[in-house]
Amino acid sequence: MIYKTFQNDLSLCLGSADTALCLPPLAYVSDKVFKYENENFLNKGWVPTGRADRLSEIGDYETLDVSGHPVILIRGNDNQLNALANSCRHRGARLLEGNGNTKGIRCPFHSWLYRIDGSFAAAPRIETSDAFLERNNDLIHYKLEERLGFLFISLEEKPGAIDKWLGNFAELHGDWPISGMKTTRKWTREFPFNWKCFLDVFNEYYHLPFVHRDSIDAVYHTPRAGDLSTGNFATQFGKTDGTGGLLESQQNYAFGNMPGLRGDALLGARYTWMFPTMTFACSNDAMWVYEARPKDERTCIVTQSTCFHPSTIAQKNFKEVSKIYYERMDTALDEDII
């Protein structure tokens, strides 16, 4: 009965912006809802996984879990990024942890060795086994695409075309030079709440006068209505007084406009939710990105990335002033986590 009521409540979320209700509470605490989300949102289609530039050198890797599947993102000798299953083909042992740079991937359990493109290289005591050598022992590859500097992974063997999935994403973000922006700081933390809670809060202005009254509220004007999206994302633009990348008391430290800005990008910030698990904001001088990967129905793993244009990074005072931008990111987040 409770889930029949939930389905009815969920249908009330499908109206216009003036009439639609918020997601029902069960969407944030139910293990059954979480299982459905995994099966239909994370195991199917494309899942955004942050910025590609963080893996810039051959052998750079990063590990993550996508819907319970352990994954390695790694740059191969051909300078292409690959998404590999982070489990040995022998007994399924986890191969790598965290992030770093490597010339090969060695299983810690039986020392099976793989090249950084995922192909099998060697294993102890297999020289006499013709049957073994004839098998495909390469690591499983997942589909991986890059658009505007963002990475998208799919666990499906034959996912739909990424550009169809994105729709008019590039068009609506064309006023900013997003593709060339570089990640200068990144951290990951675990939080004790549902992944959608985090993404909900980042994408609404309603709480600003109450939660961010003395930090960033005065920077932001009431945003425009959301733009018409033809892809798997929602986005809206709002004017700002100064930059959304700094606290209202620190606006005098602003880097100034990035090169190549036009239109809306000169006037404020665009906030975008890339379904299902990534959101970001782009102002005239910086971009900040959050990934909220679900661990279970009551826990999520959040990664924050702060990005700047290369010309900004080249400024002599970048190291000092960028810390003031990072302070704004952390202050606003700490205020949100109440």
Language model feature labels by segment:
Residues 42-46, 93, 207:
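Generic structural signal for secondary-structure transition and capping sites
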Residues 38-39, 47-64, 254:
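Active-site region of the double-stranded beta-helix
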Residues 54-157, 163-171:
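Rieske [2Fe-2S] iron-sulfur-binding domain
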Residues 43-54, 123-128, 271-276:
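Short Pro/Gly-enriched beta-strand edge/turn motifs at strand-loop
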Residues 2-31, 93-106, 138-146, 216, ...:
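N-terminal short leaders/motifs
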Residues 74-75, 80, 86, 145, ...:
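C-terminal catalytic domain of Rieske-type non-heme iron oxygenases
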